[in-house]
């Protein structure tokens, strides 16, 4: 019986998705393929905006990772578990001045919502613009059984 590792998405390891690859097409060297997308983890410390910018500079069409089902999320976690230090990564889900309407940086449809039901978003209007504060917690607890 092995122990379980719990991973939630938030802050440390930068991970990217390169969409639009066709079946049978190889990903760039150092990238891993899954369901017509290519993925790569980078151990770079940066804020979310810089992480997205860094990602778009890696390869044409690349963005921070977007997740569309539990199988894809499991694939991502298995690829990054060896480099995780604090168990958290940046992902492409954002709400930049969009008043709690979340979206992926790659423009993909938000079809897989795995955040905590207790997540909340508060909008305070100021004279100039809305001030948005939120506590969004991605709630998918990935359980990877370690050998031993």
Curated annotation (Swiss-Prot):
Residue intervals of the C-type lectin domain: 34-148
Further remark: Shows greater sequence similarity to the beta than alpha subunits compared to other heterodimer snaclecs.
Distribution of this protein across tissues and organs: Expressed by the venom gland.
Subcellular location: Secreted
PTM remark: Contains disulfide bonds.
Leader sequence residues: 1-23
Superkingdom of source: Eukaryota
Family annotation (Gene3D superfamilies): Mannose-Binding Protein A, subunit A
Family per similarity comment: Belongs to the snaclec family.
Entry GO CC: extracellular region
Quaternary assembly: Heterodimer; disulfide-linked.
Function comment: Interferes with one step of hemostasis (modulation of platelet aggregation, or coagulation cascade, for example).
The keyword Disulfide bond appears for this protein: yes
Pfam families: Lectin_C
Name of this protein: Snaclec 8
Main location: secreted
Entry GO MF terms: toxin activity
Alphabetical keyword list: Disulfide bond, Hemostasis impairing toxin, Secreted, Signal, Toxin
């Amino acid at each position: 019986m092995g122990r379980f590792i719990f991973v939630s998405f938030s802050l440390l390891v930068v991970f990217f998705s390169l969409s639009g690859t066709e079946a049978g097409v190889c990903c760039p060297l150092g990238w891993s393929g899954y369901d017509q997308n290519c993925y790569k983890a980078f151990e770079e410390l940066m804020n979310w905006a810089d992480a997205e910018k860094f990602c778009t500079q890696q390869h044409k069409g690349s963005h921070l990772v977007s997740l569309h089902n539990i199988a894809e999320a499991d694939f991502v976690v298995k690829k990054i578990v060896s480099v995780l230090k604090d168990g958290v990564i940046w992902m492409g889900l954002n709400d930049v001045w969009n008043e709690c309407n979340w979206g992926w940086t790659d423009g993909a449809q938000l079809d897989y919502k795995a955040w905590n039901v207790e997540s909340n978003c508060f909008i305070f209007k100021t004279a100039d613009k809305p001030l948005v504060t939120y506590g969004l917690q991605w709630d998918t607890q990935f359980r990877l059984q370690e050998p031993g």
